[in-house]
Amino acid sequence: MAAGAIALILAILCYFLFSTAHAHEAQSRSKVSPLKEGDTIGVLAPAAKGNMAEYTEAIDLLESLGYQVKLAPSVHKSAGYLAGSDEDRAKDINDFFQDDEVKAILCLRGGYGSARILPLLDYDAIAKHPKLFIGFSDITALHTALGEKAHMVTIHGPMLSSFKNFDYTAFTLYLFENGLSGSYPIGKLPMPEGTSLTTLVPGSATGLLEGGNLTVLASLCGTPYELKGDGAILFLEDVRVSPYEIDRLMEQLYQNGLLSRVSGIVYGDFGRAQAGAAEGDFSVDDIMTHYAKQAGKPAVKNFPIGHAANNLFLPLGIQATLQANEDGTATITLNESYLKSN
């Protein structure tokens, strides 16, 4: 074989090896450490304000699990409907990630405001101090930015507000408690008793778990913080949205290309979305199935995440497999831990 041909083959081989390694590196996320008894959980308010007098029972619950609680200044602040200025709320996040005393960060509540602080976060500094970061709803903006910019695993799960009125199930508390301590089961994700995942579009997919609140993800499209989602298993939830609003938001994700980039779609709780729909209107299931089929992706529904009493402690940025069977049954399996190796 001519020397030129050999050189060309070697060059092509090196290119593919580099590309594969680069793609793997791009997908890898920094993992986090579990909590030990006596560790400190930092509570901050990156979005809407809250009345801390309403959170006494929730703080007592964290302390009953064996943890200390440190409150960020933002939980006591107010600026319109926000928990202080954008600068104040961003500073709390930057400070807590670099505070060695704080071993995990729990968001107070959602609402609105997380997207406003994304340009103010020090992603390089945060990336050097990965730790459990937990929340959902509006916190989706932070999960997405921390995954894309700081390349770290985060947790889509209950916030302090989830525990303030005892409006949660034993399922939610059990997985939250075991998720914090590192006893969370790896393998097939559990479902609340009497419930099951249901196939909308059969098929299988493997990729990073990513996603969150549908409204927030759609609002990030076209910004520097939008979810890339290449090969991901995308999960979605929302609350107080009608079927036509879900349709509009899903169309935005479709036209953005996100639904084409992911490998599978998982629908969580959509909070009574069908209420008020007129006879003959598309159902939520119709809309969910339409977009999954249009994108050519396997899809399931009834995933226990979102604004409901059952809310999984779900690691984002780790490999998982979605299996949606022809008989209507389905499973989601975590293929790796969200925790650092010892």
Model-derived segments and spans:
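ATP/nucleoside-binding phosphotransfer catalytic cores, i.e., glycine-rich phosphate-binding loops
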Residues: 269-342
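ATP/NTP phosphate-donor binding region
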Residues: 24-101
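Conserved anion/nucleotide-ligand pocket segment
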Residues: 152-216
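Bacterial N-terminal signal peptides
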Residues: 5-17
